[in-house]
Swiss-Prot record:
Gene3D superfamilies in the cross-refs: 3.40.50.1400
Family statement: Belongs to the ferrochelatase family.
Superkingdom, natural source: Bacteria
Keyword annotations: Cytoplasm, Heme biosynthesis, Iron, Lyase, Metal-binding, Porphyrin biosynthesis
UniProt pathway annotation: Porphyrin-containing compound metabolism; protoheme biosynthesis; protoheme from protoporphyrin-IX: step 1/1
Residues noted as binding Fe cation in the record, renumbered to the chain: 214, 295
EC number: 4.98.1.1
Name listed for the protein in its UniProt record: Ferrochelatase
Single Gene Ontology BP annotation: heme biosynthetic process
Subcellular location as annotated: Cytoplasm
GO CC annotation terms, alphabetical: cytoplasm
Coiled coil region boundaries: none
Length: 356
């Protein structure tokens, strides 16, 4: 194996600790070409689509990308912000917020982000952190619930990059934080803040809160993936924090792709049923998404909203994701700090010397 060319190691005093936030990814632009390039990388991941590679590539290249690229580009264009993709914009704000919080607490760590698909990639960012002097790196996936198709593939990509390094940094990983008290508190704070600004649903009159998590094929649950259990755990803890019952609050799964059975109940049909049953108001919150993106803004805020209203519902609210809220940055800082314990994250005091 040929290893990457590296510059000589630096003086030990420059060796630093780094935190790398990792999210799924986003196209570089809301254009068919950029979206096809992004989807080709995303849907070629064997942890995302567990179908024999040769058969799947034929289906992907001939039947999916030529059509889905253009359709998805229109959806991305509908949510694109002046600064760029919502996921990238909010992720960069999370990096800024976490970096500032750690600096206030005298941490000298580097903080940056990478995307599993698209740019900036995980291998490129690991190399960039090494060049900046990082000898220890904490991989912090922005997926609170562990799944093979999200958390594991991010770690795969990082470890593959390490295989090509002659001088590897020390690595720690955050596997999941689905039940972390700070994360649950940040979720509850986000919901309460929205209700304070827009009014609380009248649960006594039948209004509902729906907690929508990203779906995965049901087959992964049967094969031992803990994602479903951890989503249920997060949902139950959030309901408890909000003092809601399972009648007032539902847990659903969105973003189904293909014809196979995915985790149920599905989000869109659930909202359609609620609207048809006479539910006046439905609020939807996505606890598994730490930053707003296509799946929350367009799928929930537009498509699912229309399903509910067309079925007879009167008032639909999409509660924004955690994004860079003060409560989430504080929670993120707490989770990161706990996982940095034992590493030299604070500057050593400069020895005081006296003249002769």
């Amino acid at each position: 194996m040929r290893f990457d060319l590296e510059r000589p190691s630096q003086n030990a005093t420059s060796h630093r600790v780094a935190v790398l936030l990792i999210n799924l990814g986003t196209p570089d632009a809301p254009t068919p070409r950029a979206v096809r390039r992004y989807l080709a990388q995303f849907l070629s991941d064997p942890r995302v689509v567990e179908i024999p590679a040769l058969l799947w590539q034929i289906i992907l290249r001939l039947l999916i990308l030529p059509f889905r690229g253009s359709a998805s580009a229109k959806k991305y264009a509908a949510v694109w912000m002046p600064e760029g993709s919502p996921l990238r914009v909010y992720t960069e704000k999370q990096v800024e917020g976490l970096r500032h919080l750690l600096q206030l607490n005298d941490y000298t760590v580097l903080v940056d982000y990478a995307m599993r698909y698209g740019t900036p990639g995980i291998p490129a960012m690991l190399n960039q952190l090494k060049l900046a002097g990082a000898e220890r790196v904490l991989l912090m996936p922005m997926y609170p619930q562990y799944s093979s198709s999200t958390t594991a593939t991010a770690f795969d990509d990082a470890f593959s990059a390490l295989k090509r390094m002659r001088n590897q940094p020390e690595i720690r990983t955050v596997r999941q934080y689905a039940d972390h008290p700070a994360y649950i508190a940040a979720l509850a704070a986000q919901v309460h803040q929205y209700w304070h600004q827009h009014g609380r649903p009248d649960f006594a009159a039948g209004d509902k809160l729906v907690l929508s998590f990203h779906g995965v094929p049901k087959r992964t649950l049967d094969l031992g993936d803990p994602y479903h259990e951890q989503c249920q755990q997060t949902g139950a803890l959030l309901m408890q924090a909000l003092e809601l019952t399972p009648v007032e609050c539902r847990i659903t799964f969105q973003s189904r792709f293909g014809k196979a059975e995915w985790l149920q109940p599905y989000t869109a049909p659930t909202l359609k049923e609620l609207g048809a049953a006479g539910v006046r108001r439905a609020d939807v919150f996505c606890p598994g998404f730490t930053a707003d993106c296509l799946e929350t803004i367009e799928e929930i805020g537009m498509e699912v909203r229309d399903e509910f209203l067309h079925a007879g519902g009167k008032d639909f609210h999409r509660i924004p994701c955690l994004n860079a809220s003060q409560a989430w940055i504080a929670a993120l800082g707490e989770i990161v700090a706990q996982n940095l314990q034992g590493w030299p994250v604070q500057a050593l005091p400069v020895p005081h010397t006296t003249g002769a």
